[in-house]
Amino acid sequence: ALTNSHQISISGGTDATTYMASISRLNQEGVVKDTGVKRTNISLNITQKLGSWLTIGMGTQAVQKEYGGIQASISDAMLQSPYGKMYNTDGSLRDYPMDETLHPNPFANANATSDKTSRNIFISTFADAMLPVKGLSFRTNFGYNYRSKFEGEYYGRNTLTGRAQNGSAKIVNEHYWDYTWENLLKYNREFGLHKIDATALFSLQQTNLQKSEQSGTSFVNDDSEYHNMAGAEENKTLKSELTETAMLSYMLRVNYNYANKYLLTVTGRSDGYSAFGENNKYAFFPSVAAAWNISQESFMESTADVLSMLKLRLSWGSNGNQAIKAYQTLDRLSLTTYLYGDKGTAVNGAFLPYDGVGNPNLKWETTRTVNAGIDFSFLNNRLSGNIDFYVSNTSDLLMKRTVPIMNGYNSIMDNVGKTRNKGVEITLNSVNVETKDFRWGSTFNFALNRDKIVELRGDGNDDLTNKWFIGEPVKVHYDYNVMGTWQENDRFELNGHTIAWDAAQKKYLNEDGEEYQKGAAPGSAKLEDRDGDGKITAKDKMIIGSKLPSFTMSLGNTINYKDFTFSFLFNGVFGVTKEMQDYNFERWSLGYNYIDGMDYWTPENPTNEMTSPGYVPYDKHTFYKKMNYVQLKNITLGYNIPQSLLSKAGIAAL
């Protein structure tokens, strides 16, 4: 797929006024037909000094995006037979290439009309003022964002979907705006070796989303497409919604610095969010941090040639998370239509769905973190870096939990459980070689994190529905353990039970004549009986592994030779357990194809590594593998045209 991008920008100004304007156009073709995007971006920024004490500025940006039409079905394309006929003799598309209705033509709806356009306008303003008190200043920032989105689709009679419904139309209109207003009062003074930097913040945010949707089928003809929704004679639907949120914040932060040796920061922040319960909208989040710049001490002067900088850091702080949708504290009704009276009159009504119950006691999720770190630099910054150790404890997690259906509902958003994260992060920067014309620098990063669930609902029980287990990571794969592949006439011992193939019943039975694994046959995945009862049940599921890696590493290199620059990055992920999509054969065996080159089990190839192509996994289990991999990415080669050549053309840099 090709991508075309063009951009024009202009900037300039005087000592009092600066400006920048730009316009860009992007046309990106999609890999799949009708999946491209066209984007136009216009921006303008201007800053003006009004005397020596006041500076104001404004920035505007307008973006329009136009998306492709109806995307061809990739899944239907993958499941098609290579012998299928995609077109009729007259050149029109066939609905079903193999004369059966299991897998439609991937382009069966390609002739549908689609218009998807979004427009976004962002306006930001600021004012910086120096107040009459020495060291005191004030800044206010205001940002407004408006986004409109329109989607119109019409499936005419020349499409598979539209032909069955005599035309099908849908339009969606969405209007969203938000604004953020920040006011900062700053005080910065030095008194001898003492330096104080204080900031007070007042912030207000508000969001508003209005959305409406119409759909219908059975139109007289296709001429009006989605522009005449009143013409729909069947399946008319109307939907609309309004979502509003607001957030109010106060913050006070004081930084103290003595002789650049001893540093102390104390912060207090209060946040209020409209979506929480009436008595829990506000929460207070304090933090404190201290640092000791040892390299500034007099007793370290003798090491200055080797140890350029050494700083110890220690901090404790808390922050909040308001990651819930609006109105989760309220009961949320859904609309329905029912027949009333002897004549069966259609009447609109409302009901409380299983997941629509509100929780008026919802409150902020809080994370408290302790961090200890060290910053260092050697040999005049030829080698530098930092090491951080941290422990984070999160309480009152905002999660949807299941409850007994006898309550009339089966899930509710709640503050449940506690989690703990701890780990280490290391960054090293080095200048490996440096001469007049040549420089080679490297950056190494290492990160290790261990997380676990400390508590769920306070009763010591795990949550199997959400796959949350006390003492285990939050994101895990919970499934049956695959020991291998069932073979013909297989027989093995496990947990004191003897499992063998019964040719008469064509089943694998235990010594009591019970089926060990329902539906298993030669070529099926062999599952492990974890609880030792001699048969496979849901109780045999186990934690296969974590979805997050044990640790990650990266190594970046930048090489400069005169005006040439070459850079590349190695990124490594280690100890992550991933679902093996190419092993999940049921997703492929629905069609006429299978993955070429895979070592499938067959009677002639009784491998123990993979199952047969037609195997349908028991209880929808899947396959996993613990993986380590290293990627080479972000390879860049650049050349800076010498300034002596550019200056003749009036160009600053190229």
What are these regions (language model features)?
Residues 76-107, 152-169, 210-238, 329-357, ...:
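Surface-exposed loop/turn segments flanking beta-strands in extracellular/periplasmic regions
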Residues 14-16, 25-29, 62-66, 144-150, ...:
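Transmembrane beta-strands of outer-membrane beta-barrel pores
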Residues 1, 213, 328, 337, ...:
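Conserved small-residue
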